[in-house]
């Protein structure tokens, strides 16, 4: 969630367990989110750059605003996401929320249990995850019809 990303602090990164601590996310709940090695590498590069240019306070916001005492706003994060997508050659309108949907869909296509996806997305109800994760067409093609298993 974009608001959760905006509120991340440097100290929320647990690189030894490859987790991000999300404090007071939606529903005012704390949770852990997975941290991919690729993302960790990118965040380390960002941290070195930000620290070298005095953009970040020790233990401060992972994505500080113009005043490092404040986090970067969600509008600025949205613009950064759109800019990165254009730089990557994506011609579709992509938002942080679109990336969240894609994350869930790719996990489903990779046959990750929906309850694990529920936890990763921070949903309290499985029904929310089921709505969120669009039915993956790749999975639909792999479903064997019960008619095909009958010995007629």
Regions found by a protein language model. Give the residues of each.
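A short, glycine-centered helix-capping/turn motif at helix boundaries
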Residues: 1-7, 27, 110-112, 123
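Short, basic (Lys/Arg/His-rich) helix/loop patches that form interaction surfaces
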Residues: 33, 78-119
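DNA/chromatin major-groove-contacting recognition/catalytic segments
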Residues: 33-34, 38, 135-152
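Alpha-helix N-cap/helix-start motif at helix boundaries, enriched for small hydrophobics
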Residues: 3-8, 35, 117
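C-terminal catalytic core of Y-nucleophile DNA break-rejoin enzymes
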Residues: 25-45, 58-80
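Short, flexible helix/strand-to-coil boundary loops that buttress conserved ligand/catalytic motifs
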Residues: 9, 17, 24, 47, ...
């Amino acid at each position: 969630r974009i608001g959760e990303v905006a509120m991340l602090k440097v100290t929320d990164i647990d690189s030894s367990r490859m987790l991000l601590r999300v404090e007071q996310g939606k529903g005012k709940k704390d949770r852990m989110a997975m941290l991919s090695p690729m993302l960790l590498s990118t965040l380390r590069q960002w941290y070195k750059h930000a620290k070298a240019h005095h953009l970040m306070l020790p233990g401060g916001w992972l994505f500080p605003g113009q005043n490092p005492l404040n986090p970067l706003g969600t509008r600025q994060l949205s613009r950064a996401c759109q800019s990165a997508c254009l730089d990557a050659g994506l011609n579709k309108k992509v938002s942080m929320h679109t990336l969240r949907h894609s994350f869930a869909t790719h996990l489903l296509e990779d046959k990750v249990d929906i309850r694990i996806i529920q936890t990763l997305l921070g949903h309290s109800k499985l029904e929310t995850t089921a709505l969120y994760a669009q039915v993956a067409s790749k999975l639909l093609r792999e479903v064997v019809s019960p008619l095909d298993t009958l010995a007629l």
